[in-house]
Amino acid sequence: MTATEIGATFADVDQRSQLRRAVFASTIGTTIEWYDFLLYSTVTGLVFGKLYFPQSDPLVATMQAYAIFFVGFVARPIGAFIFGHYGDRIGRKAALIATLLLTGFATFAVALVPSYAQIGIWGAIIMILLRFVQGIGVGGEWGGSVLLAMEWAKTNAHRGFVASWPQFGAPAGLFLANIAVLFFSWLSGDEFLSWGWRIPFFLSIIMVGIGLYIRLGIFETPVFSRILAEERTARAPSIEVFKRQPKEVVLTALARMAEQAPGYVYTAYIFTFGTVVLGASRDFLLTALIVCTALGFLWVPIAGHLSDRVGRRRMYMIGASFSGLFGFFYFWLLGTGSPGLIFLAIALSLLPIMTLYGPQAALIAESFEPRLRYSGAGIGYQLASIIAGGPAPFIAAALFAAFHSGYAIAFYILGCGVISIVAALLLKDHTNKNIDEVDVSPL
């Protein structure tokens, strides 16, 4: 298709209608992919240690299960690198369809993996491979989803709000994952351990089908279409972004530490801490997290909207400060032993994370020039999964084992918050500015 033909095609497109479709497709897609990815984190603390490492001490088995959990995070930057390349060369839409299919396949296959009792250590090995494939798909998803929505935004003044909707998918996916696990938790302990936990993984195939149908019906973004028409695509965008904007890639990863580390402590490690240390039931923890995610995904677009008013960077630094300090309040409430206060701590735990989530998508994506944006935003975003998100449950378990106090974990969260504040301060703020061409000169 020539540049003239591409221009004519988009002249006939109702931009408002396409924006709605793009936002819906992005949000539904990220919800499905995060359901798939976070379902694993929910189940890890409940059953995987018992099923795949039954001969280990319970604490060691839990840490081994979280090690498999970490494999998915190692794969995410690789997925961002691979799909960032295709997203910046072929298009956002094509890359997003591929990520959805890849993640969906891996998640469905998890439900079929035999336990240690059936095939020995091979069960854990297969789980590692599937978790790696799943991580590659999720790693390539975020950058494309945000760009699909943000690059259809009609004005610069609402970009933070528009870009925040794909972020909605993470708490919404966690909400659905916890609902699915809770729904089947009426089974006896042995039944849930034997086959009940597998059903939510099987059900993911239905959601993938819905997401695929929606994504097939959307147009490519006008920003990428112009790049394609003007023949400005980078030859190797995932490599070029490290040459042209290495600082932004690194700062993006560091800026996410205040969100990634506590986020996985509050949503994954809490199942181990809650059942083993607090003596809480599985259903109690799941119910509290369902309330937590409901509050969380309501707050995301509000925080995104506020970033359009007060500035992306300022809003993000407020969120990082909130996140860094909240850990002490969280573990103080858990330490009271009161069921009501424990429930309150869990229910409120995602509010600081979602305060970061709202402005985060626009803050990161706006930092990269359009022809390298999928690669730069995706790789920077997913590198945080290695340095903060993936190791967080493992580090939290190790800190508690060493110090026997939740406050040790709170200090870890505070350190992550400080790092994120400094990183955000060093990023340029592009709020309300034209992002068709991003200035990559030094500050």
Each PLM stretch: what is its role?
Residues A170-R215:
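Helix-loop-helix hairpin linking two adjacent transmembrane segments in secondary transporters
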Residues G211-I218, G415-S441:
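Multi-pass alpha-helical transporter architecture, strongest
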Residues S41-T42, P246-L295, G389-P393:
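Extracytoplasmic gate region of multi-pass secondary transporters
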Residues L101-I119, S321-G337:
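C-terminal ends and interior cores of transmembrane alpha-helices
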Residues R313-P359:
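C-terminal transmembrane helical hairpin of 12-TM major facilitator-type secondary transporters
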Residues Y66-H85, G104-A106, I290-A303:
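Central cavity-lining transmembrane alpha-helices of secondary-active solute carriers
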Residues G160-S185, G380-A392:
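Glycine-rich segments within core transmembrane alpha-helices of 12-TM secondary carriers
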Residues R89-L100, R309-A320:
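Cytoplasmic membrane-interface "Motif A"-like loop-to-helix N-cap segments
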